[in-house]
A protein has these predicted regions:
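NAD(P)H dinucleotide-binding glycine-rich loop of Rossmann-like/cofactor-binding domains
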Residues: 77-83, 88, 118-201, 205
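Short structural boundary motif marking the start of a folded domain
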Residues: 1-4
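Charged, glycine/proline-rich intrinsically disordered loops and linkers
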Residues: 7-35, 71-77, 166-170
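Hydrophobic/small residue at the entry helix of a nucleotide-binding pocket
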Residues: 184, 210, 218
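Glycine-rich beta-strand-centered segment in the early N-terminal region that forms part
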Residues: 33, 40-57, 71-122, 164
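Adenosine-nucleotide cofactor-binding segment
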Residues: 168-169, 198, 204-207, 215, ...
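Short Gly/aromatic-enriched secondary-structure transition segments
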Residues: 65-71
Length: 233
């Protein structure tokens, strides 16, 4: 199958060799290259679903794997394991389910979480999976959605079938790619930020996908005035 692969040269910065920070992309990976490759078809495990990818959004994180600083190191500063198939804002259709998977079946339209939490560490057990001590990142530490097919653990997947009551298959899949960035906005406003009282004024700095999602969420939750600010290039 075809996939977009990101590669780079493993060159940890000298000042960080003894700090156990090598997994941080901007401290370790240099001279990135992107290329279309033929990859082996993914092998389905017992707790996974096989998904035919329909759409996958391009996140700023993906761009920061390509962009570099003056020394040639990638700009992305989170966990990174290269080479990897990029892409985490994806949607698609399930074509096969593992023999231990419940709640999903062939033909389901799904999207997925991008933070791959373990479910066992202290952070996960206390309801903070985005702080997982064993976290993986879809499309950054494991192969992501810029491919024809992908296998995903069922526990990370969310069904979108109910949206077909109002939207076409194509439209539902497009909506599915926006759930991850809008979920980031939701987490920032209502989980980390503890929400706000109806009638409040709000300012959003930056109106990319996450910022626009924040604007919509703020308006839906009762903000009286929402001001969006961005730079003009």
């Amino acid at each position: 199958m075809k996939a977009l692969l990101a590669e780079a040269t493993w060159t940890p910065k000298k000042q960080n060799l003894n700090k156990n920070l090598g997994v941080v992309g901007s401290l370790a990976w240099k001279d990135p290259q992107f290329k279309i490759v033929d990859k082996s078809f993914p092998v389905l495990r017992h707790d996974e679903v096989l998904v035919r990818v329909k759409y996958c959004g391009v996140c700023g994180s993906d761009i920061h794997v390509y962009e570099t600083d003056k020394q040639g190191y990638i700009l992305f500063s989170g966990p990174t394991k290269l080479p990897v198939v990029l892409g985490h804002e994806l949607s698609g259709e399930i074509v096969e389910v593992g023999n231990e998977v419940k709640g999903f079946c062939q033909g389901d339209i799904i999207t997925t979480e991008s933070i791959l939490w373990c479910g066992h560490c202290t952070a996960c057990r206390t309801g903070m999976p985005n702080q997982c001590e064993n976290v993986g990142l879809l499309g950054l530490t494991v192969d992501g959605g810029f491919a024809e097919y992908i296998t995903l653990k069922a526990k990370y997947c969310w069904k979108l079938n109910h949206l077909q009551e109002r939207y076409s298959f194509e439209e539902v899949c497009k909506i599915g790619t926006l759930i991850e960035p809008i979920g980031c906005a939701y987490n920032g406003i209502f989980i980390s930020g503890n929400g706000f009282l109806p009638g409040a004024f709000a300012i959003v700095y930056g109106v990319g996908a996450i910022g626009l999602g924040a604007v919509m969420l703020l308006k839906a939750a009762g903000a009286a005035i929402v001001i969006a600010v961005d730079s003009i290039e």
